[in-house]
């Protein structure tokens, strides 16, 4: 999962890109990068770290130009610890191209071999974004008929990308001296939208992963870029758009609405906040069928993205809603912890209980989802230590039983607490008195009701159905092997959690 921004203006764009990345910081906290273009020259700065840490005044001054793009990185392919794999990526031909990408290519290894053996292009990192950039460069080189570059040439190149590339990809790219290109995979798995505004009194076109990045920088949201569609904005600010996929279906990742996106964003016509309220409503029916409401004294959310679901659940059941956990926002990230003992300590550093809300009560804790189960187990124990008589746990999402291959770096199947276990076995593993999950079809109905025009969802981590149709057991095995290689490269012990999905919720940004 990453966050991307691209801007075409007649005034300097470095500050706008920076501001947009801050608004998307929840989508990536490992690295950040910005590229601007002045004339035919690119100016780039990228490094590991959060946006505020990577870009100082001197770095911003070194990013001139009226066109640019940026990315915050949360790696799902390649080496999360390599600064070389921070985006954007650059190639010098044709024209000069810079690209940032949100998603994950499921045929990256095949493409890498094809690029070397057939297209005679060299890939210098393990990043699938560099692979995608070189595929785009090769296709653009094939379609170009000489200067000036036409929108038709650009769209023909994107059609070539769609034919070759599998997986999820929302892309923003710069073509030196010509303009900005944005496109989305044929299933629209990862979000991308476009809007317009003013920058120092001049017209601006902006694309971004989420609508909140447009609104927070003073831009008007125009629309979502359609699955398979490409949008080309020339240096004059003229917007050209064309459908470039032979067959496109709108099937966004449902986990965006469950956890990943900010609640104040609207993705593919669906308010993320309203989606989470709806999940709370459907969850209420599941709770009633498992635990009589009379046996629940209080409903407490596990911060932060579960709050809308928890408030709706409490409202419908007529049970008091209370804040029982306080999050320490100044503790470092807990994404990678060597060993269970350190992970437990990190949870208690990140969250602290308000004991008076637990003492002598039967509490229902509400979380957005349960992935590994380690954090849930520790939180349940914290509630017991605070004096709770009984601790029930409800998940606004169904059991996460399958790995995600489309840009969410979840644990391998064996590390997922729900993989191969019944709900009762999961309950015993976590240690709660009752465990209530959302059901898959209920989740889909709750969110799809907000935009019936959707063709469906990628809900692969819940139902094991991979919408691109190319994911096999071998694909999963290769992913597991890659994760093991990553753990070996960083020299950690066998208990290292190389997944990036963990306690810090998106709403911290």
Which residues are covered by each model-predicted region?
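PRPP-dependent phosphoribosyltransferase catalytic core
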Residues: 162, 177-179, 184, 203, ...
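Conserved short alpha-helical segments that host acidic/polar catalytic motifs at enzyme active sites
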Residues: 1-227, 232-297, 302, 390
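Amphipathic alpha-helical
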Residues: 135-152, 303, 311-333
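Short, glycine/charge-rich flexible loops or terminal/linker lids adjacent to PRPP-binding catalytic cores
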Residues: 316-363, 374, 401-411
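Phosphate/diphosphate-binding loops
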Residues: 160, 212-213, 217-221, 228-229, ...
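Flexible glycine/proline-rich, aromatic-decorated loop/lid segments
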Residues: 203-210, 249-250, 334-348, 393, ...
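Extended, hydrophobic alpha-helical segments in both membrane/secreted and soluble proteins
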Residues: 299-302, 306-313, 317, 321, ...
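A conserved beta-strand->alpha-helix junction
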Residues: 130-135, 321-332, 429-447
